[in-house]
Amino acid sequence: MRIERNGPVALLRMENGKANAISAALLERLDGLIEELGDARAAVITGQGTAFCAGLDLPALVDLDRTTMRGFIRRFEQVILRIFELPIPLIAAVNGHAVAGGCVLALQADVRIGADRDARIGLNETRIGIGLPGPVLETLRWQVPGSSLTPLALEGRLVSPREALQLGLFHDLVPEGDLLDRALKRAADLAALPPAGLRRVKESLRKPVAAAARANATTEGELWLDTWFSPDTQSRLRETVSRLKK
């Protein structure tokens, strides 16, 4: 990952292979980039190639024991909530696939702009047999209309960018070649607003959501681990990893 500056706007580029899968190293780098935002007044996060972020790095995680996996998922939750609570506006420029953890990452942004291209967006955890961590559910409930929760969370549907716009996952959809310019322009417009009031309103909106996400994180985390380590899910995960390695 790397960070660039465009005046008052910081641009965070995820560069972790062609899928931008979420590994322990990517989480630490992302957390470090947050520290580097400095005096930026808005930020844009995007991926590369055909992927914004294709989710958790399953090949690196599937053989972890429960204790180690617990540490990873807790760190994942900490980082996504830190992004959710950023004091400055964050724009997700979703350039391609945003699946499972990748969709979760995009959902932490204030504004999500998608590229109108062939891509899959959504939370397919239930199709593998995994639950959704408590913090993910809290932010999802807050970010999308209630009518979208069944297809996204319960059915685990992966949808096209146009369907993502209809479901409220995206706020805007633009031609692929215009994505970054549009996201940077939206961020610059937000950066031009008086910062004190903007930060106060964002904090007031998001603080109760983050508090609810943390309230039952430990209990919900153990329930999530139960689904991850169930025999059926482990079998499905290993089948998925086998396909990814081909």
PLM feature spans:
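Glycine- (often His-adjacent) and acidic-residue-rich active-site loop
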Residues: 39, 47-79, 212
